[in-house]
């Protein structure tokens, strides 16, 4: 009975977070260069659902265009990317048993960045179609994930420390190659695109893009949620897991590959946005503890709320100018992480 009541309380907490996410979406819809009253937003949403017209259809009014074509796609993308990066942070930290781990430290984001940089400045993969930059970013993340797994398996079976070291080494290599390409590139327009992309932006979100990204990120998060028992065993270590009948070797590899899928699409859609996968799990673990059955859904919802609110702030902090979201996240994330590092130990949910 006590566990049942405990589960009911946790479900209520998730419901509260879901409501907060909806409220943050509504708030972010209303702010910007053009402020929209709540009534106008409600009318635009209701009209779209009752009219039966395609979202992209012209002649539906300026409020409809602002809500459905400009703001709502980017806010949904912000929620998806925030949830995906926060969830990947949880997974990375479990894989290497280190709360400082995130997709960046294991080289996945750097691989995606190298792929996108090669596509934009060198035209690599242009034959793949108009979305070749995104495809190149995903391929870069996926290839680096495979390389991390390959290197960590050299000289015997991989473990969390070998994965961490392999990821850090490959991250440095990808960064060096990206810098090399940028340094010798003679493409001013491409350089501007890279600079803007490296700072992170959600402005280019499209409904067609969301139709591809949303199922992948949501399905991956739900899959990881079903793996809570294995993720909890990873915190105990390989020897303890083996005595309990679970070999973690294959699980680590699959989790890393699925995480690369999320990160590849996130980097393709929103550019380089750091700290979400590092800060959000670190903070949430203080409240939920290390149990991934609770940690994962809370981290996903909080990550979504965090990025939606950040995107809203980016549009109003500087009048008539949109601040790149990666800059704002770094300005918030870096001092927050330093504070957490001083106040808390690096244990999974532990404190001084």
Residue locations for each model-derived region?
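Alpha-helical transmembrane segments in inner-membrane proteins
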Residues: 1-352
């Amino acid at each position: 009975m006590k566990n049942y009541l405990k589960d009911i309380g946790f479900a209520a907490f998730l419901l509260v977070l879901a409501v907060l996410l909806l409220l943050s979406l509504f708030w972010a819809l209303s702010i910007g260069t053009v402020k929209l009253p709540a009534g106008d937003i409600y009318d635009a949403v209701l009209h779209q659902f009752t009219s039966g017209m395609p979202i992209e259809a012209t002649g539906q009014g300026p409020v409809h265009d602002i809500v459905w074509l400009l703001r709502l796609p980017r806010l949904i993308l912000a929620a998806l990317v925030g949830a995906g990066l926060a969830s990947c942070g949880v997974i990375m930290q479990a894989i290497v048993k280190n709360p400082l781990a995130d997709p960046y430290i294991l080289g996945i984001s750097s691989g995606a960045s190298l792929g996108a940089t090669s596509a934009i400045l060198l035209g690599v993969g242009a034959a793949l179609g108009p979305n070749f930059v995104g495809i190149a970013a995903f391929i870069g993340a996926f290839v680096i994930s495979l390389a991390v797994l390959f290197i960590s398996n050299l000289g015997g079976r991989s473990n969390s420390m070998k994965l961490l070291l392999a990821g850090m080494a490959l991250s440095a290599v990808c960064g060096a190659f990206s810098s090399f390409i940028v340094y010798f590139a003679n493409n001013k327009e491409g350089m501007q695109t890279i600079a803007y992309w490296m700072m992170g932006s959600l402005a280019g979100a499209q409904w067609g893009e969301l139709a591809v990204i949303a199922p992948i990120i949501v399905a991956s998060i739900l899959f990881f949620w079903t793996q809570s028992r294995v993720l909890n065993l990873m915190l105990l270590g390989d020897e303890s897991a083996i005595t309990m009948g679970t070999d973690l070797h294959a699980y680590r590899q699959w989790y890393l590959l699925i995480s690369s899928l999320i990160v590849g699409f996130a980097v393709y859609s929103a550019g380089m946005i750091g700290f979400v996968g590092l800060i959000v799990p670190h903070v949430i673990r203080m409240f939920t503890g290390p149990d991934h059955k609770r940690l994962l859904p809370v981290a996903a919802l909080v990550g979504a709320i965090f990025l939606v609110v950040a995107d809203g702030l980016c549009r109003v902090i500087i009048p008539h100018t949109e601040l790149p979201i990666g800059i704002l996240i770094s300005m918030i994330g870096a001092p927050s992480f330093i504070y957490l590092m001083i106040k808390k130990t690096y244990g999974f949910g532990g404190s001084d």
